Design a protein with these regions (language model features):
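Stable alpha-helical elements in mature extracytoplasmic
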Residues: 7, 11, 48, 65, ...
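Conserved functional loop/turn residues at catalytic and ligand-binding sites
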Residues: 6-7, 56, 80, 95, ...
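Hydrophobic residues within well-ordered alpha-helices
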Residues: 3-4, 52, 91-92, 131, ...
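Periplasmic-binding protein-like
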Residues: 32-40, 103, 107-149, 167-168
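Bilobed "Venus flytrap"/periplasmic-binding protein-like clamshell domains
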Residues: 15-16, 33-89, 103-107, 138
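Ligand-binding clefts/hinges and TM-proximal coupling segments of bilobed small-molecule sensing domains
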Residues: 64-81, 117-122, 148-168
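Acidic, polar ligand-binding/catalytic clefts
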Residues: 1-51, 117-124
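A ligand-binding cleft/hinge motif common to bilobed small-molecule-binding domains
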Residues: 13-23, 68-71, 92-125
Length: 168
């Protein structure tokens, strides 16, 4: 939405490549692969997706978690929020049993929110994360692609993951 309406030039943070999105934006080279993850309170850690049957799972609307759970786990009650902050606050407030989104996000969130644990670190298909620009913005797309290649040569992405998320 922000690219299409010319509010921003680049979407960089945790933007999953999907067919639907690729019709609206141009994706640069991917820099990371993710699956879904599930975070829940340490007092009631969800370690298997079957534990979610009949329980309330918090998700953000429009994320890959939404179609995944609707299609593959219809017994899970989905509580959907428009904004990530609202979804995370719902988990903090106990309005749901767990929260699911990209595993890198729940790992990072659990790292700074004591009392919560990622009991399911990888669920569903592996998806790629890539920057996106407005359709047809070839100059910016080429520049981003070159920067990703340069960062890849330095092992930047691997080192960053090892330093921040791998310990979780």
């Amino acid at each position: 939405e922000f690219l299409v309406t010319d509010k921003v030039d680049i979407i960089l943070a945790n933007f999953t490549v999907t067919k639907d999105r690729a019709e609206k934006v141009d994706f640069a080279l991917p820099y990371m692969k993710v699956a879904l993850g599930v975070v829940s309170p340490e007092s009631a850690v969800i370690t298997d997706v079957k534990q979610l049957d009949g329980k309330t799972l918090i998700i953000a609307k429009g994320t890959t978690a939404e179609p995944y759970f609707e299609k593959n786990h219809p017994k899970v009650k989905l509580q959907k929020y428009d904004q990530y902050t609202d979804a995370y606050n719902a988990l903090l407030d106990g309005r749901g049993d767990a929260f699911s989104t990209d595993n890198t996000e729940v790992l990072a969130w659990a790292l700074v929110h004591k009392g919560f644990k990622v009991g399911i670190p990888s669920l569903g298909d592996l998806d790629t994360i890539a920057p996106a620009v407005q359709k047809g913005n070839k100059g910016l797309l080429d520049w981003i692609n070159q920067e990703i290649v340069n960062l890849g040569k330095e092992n930047f992405f691997h080192q960053d993951y090892a330093a921040t998320l791998a310990p979780v």
